[in-house]
């Protein structure tokens, strides 16, 4: 987190609406309305801060304030100049009639002290006479005395109020439509949810590194993109107040054009960073015109000329990992890189990476070497995460089911996981075509279609094995897909030797019809779905050994449906009292609730709040982050 963002947490923004009066010896303000904006919803340009003792003492500052709503800038308030959006425009006298004052005004104060200190040491603000002050003090004393019985009553009931039996559910806006029922809301829910609980212990968000955009403090860019000549922040703040440039050319002041008056004006001299595409382009960016004075038709031996431009760059800009020329010609045909740029071999061709592409969370080298040996200085940014092994990845890759860090540390202790060390080594896993890891029993039982061709051996009872022949690869399909009229095997083996439906049961009474195919009666109630409509496992008095029996429905379920997050039995008995091994050891796309024996489908655990009974902070944080991410409002 940036220093500005950290500092803003210690401030509250007070907005007052009323009349202010000034005289030679006093200033007072009659308040009509007051609004307090909580931290993290405003941004402050710390350069413009000035102290004031009108309300909050020396801890109060008046400065440029930017208000946000859902991370979108809604208004910019400039103080100490009053925000006169609702100015009545009338002159009014002070209460004693001696001083002329302005009309209704908005006043802004960014205060570090608590709300109760706003009027401390400023009793003269309202010009109260001493008698009135005495009366106020007397009323305060009477109030304290009257509060004693109430305090005793609350103290005696404090223990009762703090127990888990206290049900705050009626006070929450939660109306569930899906199983399970709403869990009770506790006093802990009144606090904030720490987003740090979303990340594994061996993965860092590198808080405090990078540059926070002034106009959007939630947006952090890597340090490598600060003052490089490109505006990465929407407000361009990453290219302002530069002390040193990463681009090849810089100057101390520049020309700005007034869009209304169509004239160029001189601004306060400051260091600006220019890329080569802004040199010799006919636009004077520097006050002294140096960006347009270095144009030559022929460059010297110690210079490099961009293709299609008259700009001559120093040779140090060649192959330095920074795209200075608009066409990138300064970074082409590189046999050797400078300044930490990276070379990799891809498809037998030398690929030169810009410095900004190294440790950016996206592997562009075949061996992923451009994302290794990174640190928080290089892997900083609101969309990146750093593994303990030095691998830089995108935050969206954390806890996504794929192992991106060595030893899979980015998938450890994620929300919805539990400790399975006792049997983790016994569970065999298969990497399927979608890049995710699945348990072998799940991958090779035909449940996951992306795993059909990834298994060396298919489940003998639950699946049909499509043979490998020619270009056709061996794969596992569900038994219910055999003889269903659809070719699932590449060679059509699943639709061969099938009994026509019209002949089903004529010569062999031990057959029955379902889903346009014949099924042997011996396969009824065996815990395997041979029919797509699952009718072969319904109306069963007994179930085969190893299968699951739904007593309320008289149907049999395959063993792998136990604790898979889907309630197949009408009473939900197949999903009750799930263990960690049953939930995560046998399934891959499941979520184990933190403090219950409930296992849910990971993509169904939030709707939109956590469906876990007795949901913990981690369960709620997971769903809160998911909702914000899906709505495009998550700050990375």
Swiss-Prot record:
Residues 1-130 are cytoplasmic. PROSITE patterns: LDLRA_1, LDLRA_2. It is a single-pass type II membrane protein. Disulfide bonds join 213-233, 227-242, 245-273, 251-286, 280-295, 299-312, 306-325, 319-334, 337-365, 359-374, 379-392, 387-405, 399-414, 458-476, 466-489, 483-498, 504-518, 514-531, 525-540, 543-556, 550-569, 563-578. One of its GO terms (cellular component) is plasma membrane. Residues 205-243, 244-296, 298-335, 336-375, 378-415, 457-499, 503-541, 542-579 form the LDL-receptor class A domain. It comes from Caenorhabditis briggsae. This is LDL receptor repeat-containing protein egg-1. The keyword Heme does not apply. One of its GO terms (biological process) is single fertilization. InterPro entries: LDL_receptor-like_sf, LDLR-related, LDLR_class-A_CS, LDrepeatLR_classA_rpt.
